[in-house]
């Protein structure tokens, strides 16, 4: 099993795609190596590129508040990372070749941590994991707010898509939905394992209808 520090060192030295030419710092991710909850975003932004840490800008502050105030946890209790570990120029969307080159690091992180719940933030990380689960990705607004079961590495991970915090910064309705989604995760965490099935909708569920905003 990979050590997270080893993976992080590889990420910082990585030149597998063109993004290394533009970065100040690669951003491997950080948090608890035995976290029950893992957050996966899209890619680092300007602040993350400067500091080499995930979600430290304005969107990151919102994520931290949601973790603290709704989940009742600290950033040190969870693990936070991105699908792509280097900042795309001008914060553009990651390109397919960049995702292909970088995603093996994420796969190894998931295998090392073995979280109980993965919260995908926005359409890019959600789409990537849905492909891994052999599921069709609709808009983030349609699939968010539900748990999907991913049987991988010989055990079960619950994947929970929601909006990227950046999509909620200047959109009060999306922020409200994001907060509601975090409350669902809190409720699941507070439930006994036998009742957790109440929150599972399985791979056949397409998610409730919602705002079709890209949600980052």
Curated annotation (Swiss-Prot):
It is an enzyme of class 3 (hydrolase). InterPro entries: Type-4_UDG, UDG_Type-4/5, Ura-DNA_glyco_family4, Uracil-DNA_glycosylase-like, Uracil-DNA_glycosylase-like_sf. Coiled coil: none annotated. Interacts with the sliding clamp PCNA3 subunit. Pfam families: UDG (PF03167). Signal peptide: none annotated. Uracil binds at residues 41-43, 55, 82, 164. Transmembrane segments: none annotated. Keywords: 4Fe-4S, DNA damage, DNA repair, Hydrolase, Iron, Iron-sulfur, Metal-binding. Removes uracil bases that are present in DNA as a result of either deamination of cytosine or misincorporation of dUMP instead of dTMP. Can remove uracil from double-stranded DNA containing either a U/G or U/A base pair as well as from single-stranded DNA. One of its GO terms (molecular function) is metal ion binding. It catalyses: Hydrolyzes single-stranded DNA or mismatched double-stranded DNA and polynucleotides, releasing free uracil. The keyword Cell division does not apply. This is Type-4 uracil-DNA glycosylase. Its EC number is 3.2.2.27. The lineage of its organism: Archaea, Thermoproteota, Thermoprotei, Sulfolobales, Sulfolobaceae. [4Fe-4S] cluster binds at residues 14, 17, 86, 102. Belongs to the uracil-DNA glycosylase (UDG) superfamily. Type 4 (UDGa) family. Optimum temperature is 65 degrees Celsius. One of its GO terms (biological process) is DNA repair.
